[in-house]
Amino acid sequence: MSSFNKKIAKDIKKIKISLAAQDDVKNWSCGEVTKPETINYKSYKPERDGLFDELIFGPTTDFKCPICGTKYKKSDENTICEKTPMCQKYQPVILPKMVRRSRMGHIHLENPVVHFWFFKIDHSIISKLLGLRIANSNKTVSKGDLEKLIYYKSHIVLEDGGLKKLQKNAIIDISDAAIIYADALEELKERFEKDTEEYEIISEALAELESYAVSQTGQDYGIDFYEYNEIIHEFSKAKISTGSKAIEYLLENIDLKAEAEFIESEIEKINQHFDNNPTASIKAQERSKLYKRLAVVNAFIHSGQDPKSMLIYDLPVIPADLRPLVQLDGGRHSTSDVNELYRRIIIRNNRLKKWEETDAPMLIKQNEFRMIQEAVDALIDNSRKKPAPVTSKDNRPLKSISDTLTRKKGRFRQNLLGKRVDYSGRSVIVVGPELKMHQVGVPREMAAKLFEPWIIKELINGDSHINSIKAGKKAIENLDPIIWPYVEKAIEGKVVLLNRAPTLHRLSIQAYEPVLIRGKAIKLHPLSCTPFNADFDGDQMAIHVPISEEAVREARELMLASKNILGPKDGEPIINPAQDIILGLYYLTMEKAAAIDGDKVVGEGKFFATYDEMLLAYENKLVSLHARIALPISEINKKRLNYSPENKYIISTVGKFIFNRAFPESFEFIFGKHVEYVNKTDANGEVKLSEKEVVYTSNNKNQLEQFLLPYGQNFAEVIAKMPLNLPLSKKDVAKIVRRVYDKYVAIVTKSDVASVINQINANEINQIFDLCAELKDFNGKPIDVNHVEILEKIIVEEYKAISQEIIVRERTEEPIWTVNDYTKLLEIVWFKYTNIVANVLDNIKELGYKFSTISGTTISISDVITHQDTKSRIAEGDKYIELLKDYFDQGLMTDDERYNATIAKWAAIKDDIEKDLKKLTKLYPDNSLFMMFNSGARGNSSNFVQLAGMRGLMNNNTKVLKADAENERVVRSTVEIPVKSSFLNGLTAYEFYSSTHGARKGLTDTALNTAKSGYLTRRLVDVAQGITVREDDCGTDYGFQVKDILDTKTNTVIEALYDRIEGRFTNKAIYDKNGKLIVDADELITPEIATEIVENGIKKVEIRSVLSCYTPNGVCKKCYGKDLALNRVVNIGEAVGVIAAQSIGEPGTQLTMRTFHTGGVAGVEDITGGFGRLIELIDAYDSPWGRPAVIANYYGRITDIKRVKEGSESVEYDVITQEYKTRDGKVNTVEYKTRAGRKIRVKINDKVTPGQKIVEGPIVLNNLLRVGDTRLVQNYILKEVQKLYRLQGITISDKYIEIIIRQMLSKILITDSGDSDFFNGSLVDIHVYQKESARLISEGKKPPFGEVKIKGAKQIPLLSDSFLAAASYQETPKILVNASIKAQVDRLKGLKENIILGHKIPAGTNSNFEENGKYDLRNPKSYFADKYDPDIKTVKFVADENEILNMEHRVEIQHIFDEFQSEAFNANVIEFTDDSDN
């Protein structure tokens, strides 16, 4: 083991786990530990043969002889010291102290011990394997009986020796021992003649037994088993034993093959019973137990391991440095708990040796056996040890080996899956409005520490008079002013990763270019707040420095903040302006008319010759920001406007002209927002006029012409008559950002740009337009002229700039370009081209901040405007409540009905007051508060109602119990007396008190919700972590039919067909009504095609789906469709499983725990929403919250619905009768019974299909799978999950939910193994099952049969093919035990197992990605292989790039790195999970 090094770790292809036999332990061991001592109390040196012995575990000082203390050189490693006679005797090997982390020892146990995990975990593996049945009876030996046996509390009959009174495998307990032994001795006595010696001995023993059994001592302490065991064994072949020796005998004599055959025959019997009686639940349980037993027996057969390996003969002692003993100040020592547990074992083992030597009585030895067993149990798993764990002096349970593996603080999750990171730091964040999207402000002291090696390199290379690493280090530590220019130089071209915990989705870690700032806080770009969910009220963020060239390239290309504009969960821009910026833009785009606002509007109708003239007039207050003016159309700086040539002048406000300058020349001109009136049909079929807000732009010729005027018109007159545009709100700005993204996001690859740059020189600089025009976009179409112009402009500008630099640098007349110059040009062009959208966002940000400042928006109490009708509405409510009270007093309504009516009335009154106040917003458009919530900057109308109207109903903290939901009780979770005051008028003492309930409940809900949501994300990541995009096309012909997702209760659309098909591939060609092809099979449905499909009235579309993808352990590009974060087809290597988990988990916090109800019956409808329901679906609960739905079992029709009374209390039930046809054509009926009063979803004569709801409620997924097929279950889960999120206003793409559903239905329970290698009762992955079935059918053999099983998110990771991934999730001991008995091999296919081993994950840049795809991040020099490289001129061979660059300093910089790596300074943790302790 000591030879195991990092090189080997990199090459590991698979890992196998199996049981360690006695020989294995001895081979690992470097010596036996025989003494419980640790170190000498005087010399502090390890004791010989103790737990820290240097001869066994290695020296405590490098290359020092542990016996004579001689120091050796490194070159003497692995030699033997023979300096002294003692050295010659013990032959100590000279080793480095590092081996103390890998050299093991062992303790030879005098009596074998049963491994605790194998009889305690997973309902006792030993019990399942042995499956002991008591001879001549139907009784079996339970795992509890076996446990008593292991702890020497009872004995077992191993062989009956022909005695009828001793049944083989019978457990002899202390309570009935006397009777059993007496009967056995009686029977044995009859075998001998009366006067023989044997007869005498047995008679004597029998008499002694009878007299002792009735005595007080016998009744108190029981009989001495050993004495009678010996007598019985001596005179017959019967064998009775106890403890580990009995288990050893049983394991040695088990016939595994016979046992497997017996279990299979038992299962066959039960299956025959099932054919006659399909609903026998007791038999189902019995079969399930047999399946589990068969799995264990088969595991030992297939792995070929000896079951006796579950006993411990020699106990391994883990390496000394993994259980350290640390010296504290004051001469005290602190030690790992494991040492204390080992000490107890050694002390007891040594005491047993003494008893053996002195031939002590068997009872004393038995007690010692038991104590050793318990001591080893405590070492292995102290927390599970019964009755109580072993505690330390201060009564704390000691941490055993299991505890160091499991849970959040265990080895897997703390050290293997999350590590502390060098080159990192953390600080508070403050806003940096002056930063660009791709920049972060790093405090310069922090940068000096983070980039220390690079800075030292610059200092040594520069003219700083610092010429050694030590001097450089000192200058940095003292923050010598000389270093700052070199710090600037060192961070050039570097990127840093920024992370904010909790890391809920991939945008919680992004890359930025560092900018040095003074101060101690990190400066964050304000638009980056949304993806990080950060604010500036004291949040902290961590910075990490990627070191290698590949890491920097990956961070820059894939993680740079300016490239992550779209959110992965819905494909919409996640970087949207908000708050101050929105307020500024709203103010900037407001329009005012002189006729209405009078003097406030200066200069309306004026004409300016140029944009600059207009700006000058605005700055000199000759024209106001909101005044409409005219400019020549040439001055607005827009290309390709479609308008009549005679209209030369354009009308807008000064603010809009300024606003439009933020966008590129080829982007449309935005005029503002108009309200249009359109006819809309409502749910009842009535046509009503409804308002629709439309942003007018120059893209629409009709809209543009409204704002254009010909030469010679009276501008002032025309403008005065024109209607006012509305200002832009948050939603409008978000739509504009989306349009900017769609138009200007990069549509060519880096290699395309490189191919253009490769062809240019000074003579061909004019042909760049033609070269760019030849490029194709990601869909293989010629690129848009806007992109050609942008690329041409950037390349020409940068080419000229670099040429000039070369001329200055080389002092030549003509620039001589080298590969480095081409690379530099490519990097700059690529950055500028991919940064256009971010630039526009930065422009918008700057405008927003500037004009929100200029607007001078403030709020005061006078801004809170009230409505005169509020008081009368509240009075009307009081009157109505009085009326309800009268009705109740007269017995006309129940108290629950009165309560519900009260709640409903107050909710309606609050809604009316809100409508009244909304009307006021139109009358006072300049009111600061109204501006804030009309623009979407902060707050909304319901906040304003609390300020100016009434606070309304308050929640209290009444808990809704499961029983309430099942019995449909009205739960009074709302205080029925509302808070009638507003904040403006002030609350009364009672109202203030009433408000505290809701506020407190809100805070506790949020805290609980965050923890639960984090745990959900963790479970989902474990479910889907291995799923990546693996190939182009899996070739499936099996599609997934989608239509609008409807809420059948309210008949409203939850998710429209358009949203479900856009960005997916078709499975079959789609034609319109006239048979014209809209889109062919296997084509991507673009937004345009999706619109056409919907407009043609097509209601159902068959698409390619993850749910029908044939790619094992992943998906193919066609079945997945579009990568929402890039808005183009997904790339091979994308870790879509993790993205899916994050997209579902991240908004989990927003799914409220409490159930929104403002009245109405607090029944199932209210309660089934929210987070609880999501957990129910994803964990596939068998008893969901509330009453489960009643579903149809067959195809047929409803023939009768009637109400009946039953039982002594005359409980009313509804009985629904369905008629259906059996397979042989007979007509049968089936009755569904439910408590009266529940909502029935069918009528008489309705046709029903299996799985259709007959009575309202949540459907139990297992029941749905039983009556329907997997497609039915898939559709139901998808619909329910989408309903939960969409009702809360959260958009999540279907494909993410599909990935999780696919995993939930990915296992098949084998019911008939056919000719396959599977065995009955095993759970097999669906892809493995299909592959094996196909193979057997092709060979003409019998394929296996099975049924799909639905598994919840809690169980799926535990069923993973990788035991490493499963063990690091939950239930670690159970996973390791089951894997070890199978001798399971982990082939390292998923992400987690590779992280555990320190390998690169098999995704992204380490996958078989396609050329020029997202993950093809090659060295930019490779694009210019034919160009002159000055770095290679003195080198004969083309070396690795690291060897080429900085030849003279490479060794030096490597030395700096090595020194730093060993120091591991300023370490930090990237937190990948939430802070909940799950």
UniProtKB/Swiss-Prot annotation:
One of its GO terms (molecular function) is magnesium ion binding. The RNAP catalytic core consists of 2 alpha, 1 beta, 1 beta' and 1 omega subunit. When a sigma factor is associated with the core the holoenzyme is formed, which can initiate transcription. The keyword Hydrolase does not apply. DNA-dependent RNA polymerase catalyzes the transcription of DNA into RNA using the four ribonucleoside triphosphates as substrates. It catalyses: RNA(n) + a ribonucleoside 5'-triphosphate = RNA(n+1) + diphosphate. Its cofactor is Mg(2+); Zn(2+). Belongs to the RNA polymerase beta' chain family. InterPro entries: DNA-dir_RpoC_beta_prime (IPR045867), DNA-dir_RpoC_beta_prime_bact (IPR012754), RNA_pol_asu (IPR000722), RNA_pol_N (IPR006592), RNA_pol_Rpb1_1 (IPR007080), RNA_pol_Rpb1_3 (IPR007066), RNA_pol_Rpb1_3_sf (IPR042102), RNA_pol_Rpb1_4 (IPR007083). The keyword Chaperone does not apply. This is DNA-directed RNA polymerase subunit beta'. HAMAP family: RNApol_bact_RpoC. Mg(2+) binds at D535, D537, D539. It comes from Mycoplasmopsis agalactiae (strain NCTC 10123 / CIP 59.7 / PG2). Gene3D superfamilies: 1.10.132.30, 1.10.150.390, 1.10.1790.20, 1.10.40.90, 2.40.40.20, 2.40.50.100, RNA polymerase II, clamp domain, RNA polymerase Rpb1, domain 3. One of its GO terms (biological process) is DNA-templated transcription. It comes from the Bacteria. Keywords: DNA-directed RNA polymerase, Magnesium, Metal-binding, Nucleotidyltransferase, Transcription, Transferase, Zinc. PANTHER family: DNA-DIRECTED RNA POLYMERASE, DNA-DIRECTED RNA POLYMERASE SUBUNIT BETA. Binds 1 Mg(2+) ion per subunit. Binds 1 Zn(2+) ion per subunit; 2 are expected compared to other organisms. It is an enzyme of class 2 (transferase). GO terms for cellular component: DNA-directed RNA polymerase complex. Transmembrane segments: none annotated. It holds the Pfam family RNA_pol_Rpb1_4.
